[in-house]
Structure formats: structure tokens, C-alpha cells
Swiss-Prot record:
Its main location: cytoplasm. Pathway: Cofactor biosynthesis; coenzyme A biosynthesis; CoA from (R)-pantothenate: step 4/5. The record marks 17 as: Transition state stabilizer. Its EC number is 2.7.7.3. This is Phosphopantetheine adenylyltransferase. The gene is coaD. It comes from Rhizobium meliloti (strain 1021) (Ensifer meliloti). One of its GO terms (biological process) is coenzyme A biosynthetic process. It holds the Pfam family CTP_transf_like. Substrate binds at residues 9, 41, 78, 92. It is found in: Cytoplasm.
Amino acid sequence: MTTAFYPGSFDPITNGHLDVLVQALNVAAKVIVAIGVHPGKAPLFSFDERADLIRAALEETLPERAADISVVSFDNLVVDAAREHGARLLVRGLRDGTDLDYEMQMAGMNRQMAPDIQTLFLPAGTASRPITATLVRQIAAMGGDVSAFVPGAVHQALQAKRK
């Protein structure tokens, strides 16, 4: 049984993240969605809020696979966190060539530190390719409609943050 580790900030989770997650579930029996916690960063949503939004998004979009997905936090190296959770596969989504260049560097460094852990690159679908959590936050903060880019629970949470 393959366990995949899908790290990210997920601030907030977007339809692009869900696209990659669905693909990951096609190759792994279990996927661990790992929220990176960085003490120096001030995310829009707290860890608990992000975890709740991920769970709500899964119930909304992938209820039949929710049992195959867990949500954890980590504040150490991705490869160390993956090992701690028994995962030997890192999942990374790619939107464009810029993502590929960056992710190839990261995969190379991770491979040096942890040769037992492989990185799996999954291309974003056409509809989710332009979506980034940063753009979603910016558009929502200016009162724009982000409902096409995020699950319903996230859209509601972003609206509540704006009030």
C-alpha cells in the first residue's frame, strides 16, 4: 500500500490543490495532506482553520475517498515529515515551466537527503492551471468572486474573513 505525502501551505486549499489530490489518489492508496507551519509567516488562516477547510473541501468534493486522506501539520524538512508519517512518495503539482524548474531543484535536494523518498510530479488540469492560493487571497480581499477557484466552504470562509 503506497502512502503519498502532499505538502503545502494550503492557505487556503483551492480547486487546483484538489485537482492534484484527486490525481494522487489514483496512484496512492492513502494521501497525507501536510500543512507546513512556518513560525515566521502570518497565514490568512490558522493551521486549525486550514485543516478544517481541507476536511470540508474533501467532504464536499471527494466524500467517497475522505477515509483515504488525512491532514497533518509539519514544521521540519518535508522528507523528514514524510518519513515520520510512513510516506515514501512526495506529491507535487505543476502548473507551468516555472513550477517545474523550482520543483526539480527541490526534488534534487530531497533526493540527496532522502534517496528512499521519490517525488511524483502531477500536472495541473487546464481549468486549475492559473489558480494560486495567493491570487485567490488577493482577489477575495478586494471583494472579487473566487467561487470558481475554491470549494464552497473556502469561499464562505474567505467572505467571512473580509467582513
